């Protein structure tokens, strides 16, 4: 459904977030409002962005075995991004789906966690996602990753990241 591409369009509780270890499935993309999704060309725009991200994510080496998130009821999280461990604390707002991750290396990310048809999506502004990936993977010279930051500049209100499944 088109609403799968709009953040906050479904009910999502902290208990749902904490229910599983969420493993990388594919690139994720959603818009912050139905209006912005419609302006961008709807699901077609979201699919285009996901296809582009897929190419870059494959080159970067993301897989279900090396990229995952585990959220705990006590407000802590453990994650691996391309095999690099990242852990810390988080807050999650069930109304807005805003998630704030504060981790080691002074890395923090504000984004959104939302339910989709096959699991959840964890999504961020592309430049913030790029910073985390570069810092954790030491791939700052990798031109593939640089493109991730460029992908969304043509779309207002888009967030990118990871679609995750159980």
Sequence positions of predicted segments:
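Lipid interaction determinants
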Residues: 1-74, 78-80, 84-86, 94-166
